[in-house]
């Protein structure tokens, strides 16, 4: 029965045997394109990050999250929602811009310790550097597969990286109201607080939504969660809440339905397990590593959920809305969520996201626009897209990307 369950494509991206121009490179290039066109993501078998480094990063994350709250709250950034975020002690995350640059990694640990922590800084920087090399390989493969090699250097030079270190704690039971309450968000100016949100029909749903927003995420203070796992899409409320799937943001949902009688026990239990609701990323690409405990689930075009199981030396490569727009819709940004089901176990995940630099105009290369594939999105500055997320129209749109720059959007 298990063998019939849908699975993401698994592609070997070992840099020891994968060289540009080789027959393997050509084969992998084709596989990457097909996987992204079909699923918007894939699992990658890698050797760029050693098991020793993976273990060291996990220990570093455990040390970071074990710090006193007042220390963790010093992880603040100039832009709101890009620093430390905690929700009821059940989920936390750190944000590190340009984590692949040692100086920036040092700045991060200096926020937490008076003298910093050079060992952890170097470990984070090395980890981010290895994942960044992998990301650049993937994006090179993508652009080559569409015959736009001339665009590779410009594209790679127009982006930067942000790392997210994340911790989820599963509930001790399935009490779906146990986690609704106050949150702490130190790097933010405001919260998307969905306690007792009221939907369009006037029904109150007891959901706590805290959104950690950076350069490329929607802070959605009107999200309705709980009437089925995909309520964001079905009720015309933007589901683009990003965390483990967004370059600059983390949305943490801890709590579920408290007042909707139409929701069955099974659906309510699923919602109670959500550490992150169904959403798409805003980044170009994301590389996610799940440490030992699974939780990430990806939605297929057929509407089925694929639960991605952690495996040694594997990561998940996922496309975001920015890549979808750049590639003229050829590559979708898939809906995904985090659902922690193992009781009394802590889940750690680390992710690196590539994002367009401020001022760079995202515009599909002419080679990707033809009669079969008419232009799907207007050129736009990523910062303008981010600002649109904060408007009422941006929050309410089923697809913020489509509403902002889709050719059919009334703009």
UniProtKB/Swiss-Prot annotation:
Fe2OG dioxygenase domain boundaries: 259-356
Gene Ontology molecular function, alphabetical: 2-oxoglutarate-dependent dioxygenase activity; metal ion binding
Cited function: 2-oxoglutarate-dependent dioxygenase involved in glucosinolates biosynthesis. Catalyzes the conversion of methylsulfinylalkyl glucosinolates to hydroxyalkyl glucosinolates.
Annotated cofactor note: Binds 1 Fe(2+) ion per subunit.
UniProt name for this protein: 2-oxoglutarate-dependent dioxygenase AOP3
Cofactor: Fe(2+)
EC number: 1.14.11.-
A Pfam family: 2OG-FeII_Oxy
Binding site for 2-oxoglutarate: 347
One GO BP: glucosinolate biosynthetic process
Keyword ATP-binding: no
Entry similarity comment: Belongs to the iron/ascorbate-dependent oxidoreductase family.
Chain residues that bind Fe cation: 279, 281, 336
Tissue-specific expression: Not expressed.
Record keywords: Dioxygenase, Iron, Metal-binding, Oxidoreductase
Record Gene3D superfamilies: B-lactam Antibiotic, Isopenicillin N Synthase, Chain
């Amino acid at each position: 029965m298990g063998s019939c369950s849908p699975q993401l494509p698994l592609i070997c991206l070992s840099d020891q045997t994968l060289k540009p121009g080789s027959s393997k490179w050509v084969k992998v290039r084709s596989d990457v394109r097909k996987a992204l066109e079909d699923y918007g993501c894939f699992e990658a078998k890698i050797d760029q990050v050693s098991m020793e480094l993976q273990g060291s990063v996990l220990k570093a994350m455990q040390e970071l999250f074990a710090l006193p709250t007042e220390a963790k709250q010093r992880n603040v950034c100039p832009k709101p929602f890009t620093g430390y975020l905690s929700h009821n002690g059940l989920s936390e995350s750190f944000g590190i811009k340009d984590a692949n640059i040692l100086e920036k990694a040092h700045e991060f640990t200096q926020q937490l310790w008076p003298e910093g922590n050079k060992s952890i800084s170097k470990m984070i920087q090395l980890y981010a550097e290895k994942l960044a090399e992998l990301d650049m390989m993937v994006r090179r493969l993508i652009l080559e597969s569409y015959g736009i090699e001339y665009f590779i250097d410009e594209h790679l030079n127009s982006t930067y990286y942000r790392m997210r270190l994340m911790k989820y704690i599963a509930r001790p039971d399935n009490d779906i109201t146990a986690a609704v309450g106050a949150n702490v968000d130190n790097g933010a100016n405001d919260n998307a607080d969905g306690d007792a949100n009221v939907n369009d029909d006037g029904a109150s749903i007891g959901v706590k939504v805290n959104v950690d927003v950076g350069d490329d995420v929607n802070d959605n203070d009107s999200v309705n969660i709980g009437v089925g796992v995909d309520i964001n899409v079905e009720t015309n409320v933007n589901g683009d809440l990003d965390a483990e799937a967004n370059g600059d943001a983390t949305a943490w949902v801890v709590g579920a339905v408290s007042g909707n009688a139409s929701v069955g026990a099974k659906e309510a239990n699923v919602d109670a397990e959500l550490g992150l609701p169904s959403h798409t990323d805003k980044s170009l690409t994301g590389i996610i590593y799940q440490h030992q405990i699974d939780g990430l689930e990806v939605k297929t075009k057929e509407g089925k959920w694929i639960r991605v199981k952690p495996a040694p030396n594997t990561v998940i490569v996922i496309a975001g809305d920015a890549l979808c727009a750049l590639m003229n819709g050829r590559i979708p940004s898939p809906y995904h969520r985090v659902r922690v089901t193992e009781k009394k176990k802590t889940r750690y995940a680390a992710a690196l996201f590539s994002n367009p630099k401020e001022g760079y105009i995202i515009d599909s290369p002419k080679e990707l626009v033809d009669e079969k594939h008419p232009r799907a999105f207007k050129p736009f500055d990523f910062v303008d897209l981010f600002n649109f997320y904060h408007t009422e129209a941006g929050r309410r749109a089923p697809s913020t990307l489509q509403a902002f720059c889709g050719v059919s959007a009334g703009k």
